[in-house]
From Swiss-Prot:
This is NAD(P)H-quinone oxidoreductase subunit 2 A, chloroplastic. One of its GO terms (molecular function) is quinone binding. It catalyses: a plastoquinone + NADH + (n+1) H(+)(in) = a plastoquinol + NAD(+) + n H(+)(out); a plastoquinone + NADPH + (n+1) H(+)(in) = a plastoquinol + NADP(+) + n H(+)(out). Keywords: Chloroplast, Membrane, NAD, NADP, Plastid, Plastoquinone, Quinone, Thylakoid, Translocase, Transmembrane, Transmembrane helix, Transport. It is a multi-pass membrane protein. The chain crosses the membrane at residues 24-44, 57-77, 99-119, 124-144, 149-169, 183-203, 227-247, 295-315, 323-343, 354-374, 395-415, 418-438, 482-502. HAMAP family: NDH1_NuoN_1 (MF_00445). The gene is ndhB1. Its main location: plastid. InterPro entries: NADH-Q_OxRdtase_suN/2, ND/Mrp_TM, Ndh2_N. Belongs to the complex I subunit 2 family. It is found in: Plastid, Chloroplast thylakoid membrane. It comes from the Eukaryota.
């Protein structure tokens, strides 16, 4: 009898939960329409994979790319709509969140063509790879719009779990297994630290989980200047630091970059930073509004360490992917300047603009590395010597992307850094901007060293990899070159394009 009553109660509770979820999806589903498109694409991928043979594999790429493009289109149609909070306060829709979602979708759209030939040559499972990429994209999009602590914790876990699986996708490669093990262990530790910081924030605010309600709760409980908030700030900064990978939270980055498949590295190098930057901006700016001096100081220290450590160690690297790993550590130091400046002096607009350029510069560089790696089977920097004599197009494309990463005029990277540093200077961050300028000059040194090797490698310096270099006969090679061309063009856009981009970015301020 007792079991029968308990069973009825369980059925009633399950029915209520289902009806509430259906009600939320029915009335709030329009707010996550771009995300719903990706979910539909995921379901369609599974259906086609389970009912088709190997000959229908091009459809998987087509469906993945189409769902991403349709999500971008849905975002653009929703542009400039009034900010809305949906799903009982768990998700917020506004221009600021949507532009970060657009950047994530753009990264994923460009990364899929990069992966086509690599997957075919390495004979990796196609469906699972695309599923992980789309699911990670979905997690990043939900993180950008997350408005409460639970969603901010769950969404990056969705992204991170797929990232762990992608980094260890080549199971026969010992370096890939090592990379995913380190990534998983350190990612799990950082998630624990992050949720511990959330628990302090939750308790100090009187049990609130929504970001704005946390501020109101801290005011009501008079805990906004308490030691508990300082503890929460430290733990949350460490937890978010793993996602952004600034120094000293960068230890996992070089090993994961070197051991993971190159298209995966291209995907992780940009999407994780975009999603984490969006989340960090809102977390620091809203719940820690009363502790702005404290988190400004913490981020300044992280930015200085990142710019110095990343660019100094990058000089000594012999692997192209490890060099880009340390370069990305330095690049995130520049992005942090925009987070510190905030919206009062155009910091967020400059950060968004620079991240848009960084996506094109970084993905363009990785596209060149994917092509070279597939044709030669090496990642060593010295093996690039004399590439210009064999493939001028690839060598020039790589040179332009590296020069843009270094910030040489008149390339896009120069104007992105210039605007970012100018906003920091106007905000009074003189020491931070000075460090940024010095480390930018330092980064140009190791980029130019690679370019010199590409263009002027002597006969005795040319390794057998370049001497026997030949183009790939695979037709899918065109997709990699297409992504590379798009990224190279975007990396070389002159300063005339800056004004409309900055105006759009300034419209995203909450």
């Amino acid at each position: 009898m007792i079991w029968h009553v308990q069973n009825e109660n369980f059925i009633l509770d399950s029915t209520r939960i289902f009806m509430k979820a259906f009600h939320l999806l029915l009335f709030d589903g329009s707010f996550i329409f771009p995300e719903c498109i990706l979910i539909f694409g995921l379901i369609l991928l599974l259906m086609i994979d389970s009912t088709s043979d190997q000959k229908d594999m091009p459809w998987l790429y087509f469906i993945s790319s189409t769902s991403l493009v349709m999500s971008i289109t849905a975002l653009l149609f929703r542009w400039r709509e009034e900010p809305m909070i949906s799903f009982s306060g768990n998700f917020q829709t506004n221009n600021f969140n949507e532009i970060f979602q657009f950047l994530i979708l753009l990264c994923s759209t460009l990364c899929i063509p990069l992966s086509v030939e690599y997957i075919e040559c390495t004979e990796m499972a196609i469906t699972e790879f695309l599923l992980f990429v789309l699911t990670a994209t979905l997690g990043g999009m939900f993180l950008c719009g997350a408005n409460d602590l639970i969603t901010i914790f769950v969404a990056p876990e969705c992204f991170s779990l797929c990232s762990y699986l992608l980094s260890g996708y080549t199971k026969k490669d010992v370096r890939s297994n090592e990379a995913t093990t380190k990534y998983l262990l350190m990612g799990g530790a950082s998630s624990s630290i992050l949720v511990h910081g959330f628990s302090w924030l939750y308790g100090s605010s009187g049990g609130e989980i929504e970001l704005q309600e946390i501020v109101n709760g801290l005011i009501n409980t008079q805990m906004y200047n308490s030691p508990g908030i300082s503890i929460a700030l430290i733990f949350i900064t460490v937890g978010i630091g793993f996602k952004l990978s600034p120094a000293p939270s960068h230890q996992w980055t070089p090993d994961v970059y070197e051991g993971s498949p190159t298209p995966v590295v291209a995907f992780l190098s940009v999407t994780s930073k975009v999603a984490a930057s969006a989340s960090a901006t809102r977390i620091f700016d809203i719940p820690f509004y009363f502790s702005s001096n404290e988190w400004h100081l913490l981020l300044e220290i992280l930015a200085i360490l990142s710019m110095i450590v990343g660019n100094l160690i990058a000089i000594t690297q012999t692997s192209m992917k490890r060099m880009l790993a340390y370069s990305s550590i330095g690049q995130i130091g520049y992005v942090i300047i925009g987070i510190i400046v905030g919206d009062s002096n155009g910091g967020y607009a400059s950060m968004i603009t620079y991240m848009l350029f960084y996506i094109s510069m970084n993905l363009g560089t990785f596209a060149c590395i994917v092509l070279f790696g597939l044709r030669t089977g090496t990642d060593n920097i010295r093996d690039y010597a004399g590439l210009y004599t064999k493939d001028p197009f690839l060598a020039l494309s790589l040179a332009l992307c590296l020069l843009s990463l270094g910030g040489l005029p008149p390339l896009a990277g120069f104007f992105g850094k210039l605007h970012l540093f100018w906003c920091g200077w106007q905000a009074g961050l003189y020491f931070l901007v000075s460090i940024g300028l010095l480390t930018s000059v330092l980064s140009i040194y190791y980029y130019l060293k690679i370019i010199k090797l590409l263009m002027t490698g002597q006969n005795q310096e040319i390794t057998p990899h370049v001497r026997n270099y030949r183009g790939s006969p695979l037709r899918s090679n065109n997709s990699i070159e297409l992504s590379m061309i798009v990224c190279v063009i975007a990396s070389t856009i002159p300063g005339i394009s800056m004004s409309p981009i900055i105006e759009i970015a300034q419209d995203t301020l909450f």
